[in-house]
């Protein structure tokens, strides 16, 4: 069993990107997702608030929520997947919860979070995409 765990750790250590910015719950982020359409490849941005973060090594995910024409749209992004082309933290917010699921029942201005003024990390771009 110990050899199996060592093998899994060795594989995951190769897939984990160490230069990813520190993404926290409450952050307003823009994630560029690489989409293959026929023989063309393009990057589609998805901008929204991080409402949850699941830490599991190479399987870590973030759930991002945005409101589009009055309808809430949520999407779960695996942080270390090759389809994530870039990641940018646009704004930080002061939150006192680990999961912001209460934002699902709110609309309009009620979904705003109190901004935290601190230096933001650099834009991260996947070097394998270019």
From Swiss-Prot:
<keyword id="KW-0150">Chloroplast</keyword>
<dbReference type="GO" id="GO:0006412">
    <property type="term" value="P:translation"/>
</dbReference>
<dbReference type="GO" id="GO:0009507">
    <property type="term" value="C:chloroplast"/>
</dbReference>
<dbReference type="GO" id="GO:1990904">
    <property type="term" value="C:ribonucleoprotein complex"/>
</dbReference>
<keyword id="KW-0934">Plastid</keyword>
<comment type="similarity">
    <text>Belongs to the bacterial ribosomal protein bL19 family.</text>
</comment>
<keyword id="KW-0687">Ribonucleoprotein</keyword>
<dbReference type="GO" id="GO:0005840">
    <property type="term" value="C:ribosome"/>
</dbReference>
<keyword id="KW-0689">Ribosomal protein</keyword>
<dbReference type="GO" id="GO:0003735">
    <property type="term" value="F:structural constituent of ribosome"/>
</dbReference>
<dbReference type="InterPro" id="IPR038657">
    <property type="entry name" value="Ribosomal_bL19_sf"/>
</dbReference>
<dbReference type="InterPro" id="IPR001857">
    <property type="entry name" value="Ribosomal_bL19"/>
</dbReference>
<dbReference type="InterPro" id="IPR008991">
    <property type="entry name" value="Translation_prot_SH3-like_sf"/>
</dbReference>
<dbReference type="Pfam" id="PF01245">
    <property type="entry name" value="Ribosomal_L19"/>
</dbReference>
<dbReference type="InterPro" id="IPR018257">
    <property type="entry name" value="Ribosomal_bL19_CS"/>
</dbReference>
<protein>
    <recommendedName>
        <fullName>Large ribosomal subunit protein bL19c</fullName>
    </recommendedName>
</protein>
